[in-house]
């Protein structure tokens, strides 16, 4: 399942990142250095070295944004997030069809991590370049993705995908990988659906409460008592439904999560 994560970074954060990436002293290296053996022949881009003096602050900014974004946290259920890579695709560069390595070595801990999910964050707008679409292939066909700056796409690392050749301008992006607490994409999707339903029901409960208070304020004393009693009953039923849904979510998480 693909998840579009909107407004992961704001305008100020994007400006901070792109000013570093377009600075003449940025330490770029051949993207092939971080590609798996089978993908090296397909990969043609530049990547900011993790040894660049600005890299750690940039990485921290992006990782903190991910950990604070409710859609990412709900959909990914992250256990480990790989320190990101910042990439640039210039005229004539692209990345042929490939699948990400199932296991990657974390550059800090030196421990192997399983890649369950891949994430691409777009750092400049579609109008800044032509080509450069991220094309993800799954059982439903191919999905061509070219998002606004600050938006990201999260997708299963099992998917074949490519970056189309850039025909003008420059494409800037951040990529990272996630080892989830829940290995199965299907199970993660069920949990995410339950989480979203739980949130929507709570929002409905709050909205109904506000509406009831407004109605009571405009009613007679007798009507107010009847409305208050009915509203209290409805709220209790909705609250019970929410808690049963919450119970199901956490019990499934206990069943499926790998600590």
Curated annotation (Swiss-Prot):
GO MF annotation terms: 2-oxoglutarate-dependent dioxygenase activity; iron ion binding; L-ascorbic acid binding
Keyword Metal-binding: yes
Highest taxon in the source lineage: Bacteria
Top enzyme class: oxidoreductase
Binding site for Fe cation: 98, 100, 161
Endpoints of the signal sequence: none
Cofactor field: Fe(2+); L-ascorbate
Sequence ranges assigned to domain Fe2OG dioxygenase in this UniProt record: 80-180
Descriptive protein name: PKHD-type hydroxylase PsycPRwf_1523
Alphabetical list of SUPFAM superfamilies matching this protein: Clavaminate synthase-like
Membrane-spanning segments: none
Annotated binding of 2-oxoglutarate, by residue: 171
Comment on bound cofactor: Binds 1 Fe(2+) ion per subunit.
Any GO BP: intracellular iron ion homeostasis
Protein EC: 1.14.11.-
UniProt cross-references to InterPro entries, sorted A to Z: Oxoglu/Fe-dep_dioxygenase_dom, PKHD_C, PKHD_hydroxylase, Pro_4_hyd_alph, Pro_4_hyd_alph_FE2OG_OXY
Keywords: Dioxygenase, Iron, Metal-binding, Oxidoreductase, Vitamin C
